[in-house]
A protein has these predicted regions:
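Conserved ABC ATPase "signature" region
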Residues: 124-140
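Conserved ABC transporter NBD signature motif
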Residues: 73-81, 90
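The feature captures the beta-strand-to-loop junction immediately N-terminal to the Walker
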Residues: 50-52
């Protein structure tokens, strides 16, 4: 099907089910972060987004979640323009794990985790398995503000799990987590994908990306982007182009670059 976007004729891939970006351009001030991205999130995949600080990763997730508008292009959810959908409707399908704090939340850990069911207008049900998964059972009655950074990150992840979105957007979810919980998070992402959901992670470590992502999106922060498999994109030259001279040492190439 053909249609016009920003005055240009395109195949209307945006009418496909799921979350789709068509000719998406992001800018901050007079700087173009990303230009003319076409992206369809596939059910059953983990997509990793890599780029230097300030390259537009968080901005892109906010646009995909419907919390910010692109400079050009459009985002659709099941064929509907994202901006035409009510916030609660979006939240029933799309979950966003942002960076940062909780905006002065003063309740308990259990209360915070239960907010994941707010878009559905009914009680949160049994939180026990989610609290157990993220090792929050003993912390549940404590005020969220008394937790360490890693414990709060686990509470955010539990809240997202309670929301149970079919499209999960996670902004630097490995932040503050110890190695055991980083591995647990990435295993959770794979289980979600295996259940037919779409998972998007912003990452910095190419080795995690190689092992746990089906596709990668590189954002160069100057309008350029690359989309492909880990085998296609994870090379010393591409990493130095993405992050700068000397950063190829971050990549320990392994024969196995497919998701585990």
């Amino acid at each position: 099907m053909l249609g016009f976007v920003n005055g240009r004729l395109h195949f209307m891939e945006s009418l496909a089910p799921g979350l789709t970006a068509l000719q998406l351009t992001l800018r901050t001030g007079d700087r173009t972060l990303m230009e003319s991205l076409d992206l369809a999130l596939e059910p059953g995949e983990v997509l990793g987004i890599l780029g230097a600080n300030g390259a537009g990763k968080s901005t892109l997730l906010n646009v995909l979640a419907g919390l910010a508008a692109p400079a050009q292009g459009r985002v659709t959810l099941d064929g509907h323009a994202l901006e035409t959908l009510a916030p609660l409707t979006r939240a029933q399908r799309i979950g966003l794990l942002p960076q940062g704090d909780e905006g002065g939340f003063f309740g308990s850990v259990a209360d915070f985790v239960a907010l994941g069911r707010y878009p559905f207008g009914h009680d949160s049900g049994d939180l026990t398995p989610h609290l157990a998964t993220w090792e929050l059972t003993e912390l549940a009655p404590r005020p969220l503000a008394t937790l360490s950074g890693g414990e709060r990150q686990r509470a955010r992840l539990a809240q997202l799990a309670v929301q149970a979105p079919c499209i999960a957007l996670l902004d630097e979810p490995l932040t503050h987590l110890d190695p055991a919980h980083q591995a647990r998070l990435l295993a959770w992402a794979r289980r979600e994908a295996d259940a037919g959901h779409s998972v998007v992670l912003t990452l910095h470590d190419p080795n995690w990306a190689a092992c746990h992502c089906d596709r990668l999106l590189f954002l160069h922060g100057d309008g350029r982007w690359q989309l492909g498999t880990p085998a296609d994109l994870l090379t010393p030259d591409s990493l130095e182009a993405l992050y700068g001279s000397g950063t190829a040492a971050l990549w320990r190439r392994n024969e196995r670059v497919q998701p585990v």
